[in-house]
Amino acid sequence: MNISIIVAMSQNLVIGQKNSIPWNIPKDLSWFKKHTIKKSIIMGRKTWESIGRVLPMRQNIVLTRQKNIKNTNVLFVNSISKAIQSALYKNEIMIIGGSNLYNQMLTSANKLYITHIEKYILGDTYFPTYDHLPWKIIFKKKIIEHEKTKNSFYVTFKILKKIT
């Protein structure tokens, strides 16, 4: 079983601001969909609330201590081990956020799927530092977002695999 993390982050490791994503990058949404479709996705409650709906064609698993949350198309669990055991798609389980879950799962992950927004963005939620761990880049593609405007910036899509 492979555990992977998928994340979009700014140059200063920001992943969120006031329980939402502080950017709108359609190619990042396509990247996210491509790499999570037909997989089990595990997220924290705040991430679930910020998304606001079930992500289709995926098994949605939400990690929470709250007992009163219900949705027939979502599995709510109270521990990471239960989330992983409950995953129907064992080939690759995707951790999709938020910050607390990323912190807990970073050392267990086999792969990181990163959208790196190459600019500094204000935020209140961060991805943990990860460059101290043994990763190897197995995919990298750089694009320009908003190319024809003065607000253009680079976005790099990367897949890192843990060196074992």
UniProtKB/Swiss-Prot annotation:
GO BP terms in the entry: dihydrofolate metabolic process; folic acid metabolic process; one-carbon metabolic process; tetrahydrofolate biosynthetic process
Name of one Pfam family that matches: DHFR_1
Entry keyword Oxidoreductase: yes
Keyword Transferase in annotation: no
Binding site for NADP(+): 7-8, 15-20, 44-47, 63-66, 96-101
GO CC terms of this entry: cytosol
Catalytic activity: (6S)-5,6,7,8-tetrahydrofolate + NADP(+) = 7,8-dihydrofolate + NADPH + H(+)
Biological pathway: Cofactor biosynthesis; tetrahydrofolate biosynthesis; 5,6,7,8-tetrahydrofolate from 7,8-dihydrofolate: step 1/1
InterPro entries named in the record: DHFR, DHFR-like_dom_sf, DHFR_CS, DHFR_dom
Function comment: Key enzyme in folate metabolism. Catalyzes an essential reaction for de novo glycine and purine synthesis, and for DNA precursor synthesis.
Family (UniProt): Belongs to the dihydrofolate reductase family.
Protein name: Dihydrofolate reductase
Source taxonomy: Bacteria, Pseudomonadati, Pseudomonadota, Gammaproteobacteria, Enterobacterales
